Regions:
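Conserved structural motif at the start of ABC-family nucleotide-binding domains
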Residues: 19-21, 34
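Conserved ABC ATPase signature
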Residues: 149-153
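Helix-to-loop junction immediately C-terminal to a conserved catalytic motif
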Residues: 65
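The feature captures the beta-strand-to-loop junction immediately N-terminal to the Walker
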Residues: 50-52
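Q-loop/switch helix immediately C-terminal to the Walker
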Residues: 102, 109-120
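Conserved ABC ATPase "signature" region
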Residues: 127-145, 196
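ABC ATPase NBD coupling module
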Residues: 82-97, 102, 240-244
Length: 258
């Protein structure tokens, strides 16, 4: 039995949408991956996508960034139709940040040198570049790890590093792909707090995809559940756990909220 004791409670009814899918469908050959998806991610929201592995969550991220394009439908970012925009133009113009499930850093560079290397690509001003690197190391409480090679960091420390790397470009939208996967309970809690604090302080829009309901729902404002290429439910976490479609598709009857 999974028990969640507290949900975030925030309203986004009057906020502008940052990412919007309109009638998006995608097929690979004869296999239908996404079937007429319609949803919005609002400004300043922590939005979650929940579903089993292979349901299309990472595919949605690839569509948002422009790595792939849909067969049908429109993708809008801040109200502008970006369907067909190449990935480099889309990520730069709309300031999209992406944190992959695996990797995203240089194994044989120290934590500090990872940040320094990427900062030299995305930040022109040398003084600000150094300040930004030091700020992120301090913000994520990585000071005592900055001289350790990335390959020797723990799972949670690597996640913090990759998130810090993604923030060097000062994104307005941050996509986190399976960020809780293969982490222990205490590390997951730490990462949840990091994500919530990041949004609260920077007002960034964050979208997380994951396959574990208890991990995702504890830190998002709204979530949608995917099954067989469709959205079967979308609501606040507290409403989702009581949604019959969500229970039938994903939670089961033993998922409770106290």
């Amino acid at each position: 039995m999974a028990i969640i004791k507290k949900f975030r409670i925030k309203s986004f009814k009057n906020k502008n949408s940052v990412v919007e899918f309109e009638n998006i469908s995608l097929s690979y050959g004869n296999r239908l991956i996404l079937d007429n998806l319609n949803f919005k991610i609002n400004e300043g929201q922590i939005f979650g996508m929940l579903g089993p592995n292979g349901v299309g969550k990472s595919t949605i991220f690839n569509l948002i960034t422009g790595l792939i394009n849909p067969n049908n439908g429109k993708i809008k970012i801040t109200g502008q139709n970006v369907t067909g925009y190449p990935i480099y133009l889309r990520t730069k113009k709309f300031k999209l940040g992406y944190v992959p499930q695996y990797g995203g850093f240089f194994n044989d560079l120290t934590l500090h040198d990872n940040l320094k290397a990427i900062s030299e690509i995305v930040i022109k001003n040398k003084v600000y570049r150094s300040e930004k690197v030091n700020y992120l190391i301090s913000k994520f409480e990585l000071d005592n790890l900055k001289d350790i090679k990335a390959k020797f960091l723990s799972g949670g420390q690597k996640k913090k590093l990759v998130i810090a790397l993604s923030l060097l470009g000062e994104p307005k939208v941050l996509l986190l792909d399976e960020c809780f996967a293969a982490l222990d309970v205490l590390t997951i809690k730490m990462l949840q707090e990091t994500i919530v604090n990041l949004q609260s302080e920077s007002k960034i829009t964050i979208c997380i995809c994951d396959h574990q309901a208890r991990d995702l729902l504890a830190c998002v404002d709204e979530a949608m559940i995917l099954s067989n290429g469709k959205i079967v439910a979308q609501d606040t976490p507290s409403n989702l756990v009581n949604n019959i479609n969500a229970k039938n598709a994903y939670f089961g009857d033993n998922f409770k909220f106290n």
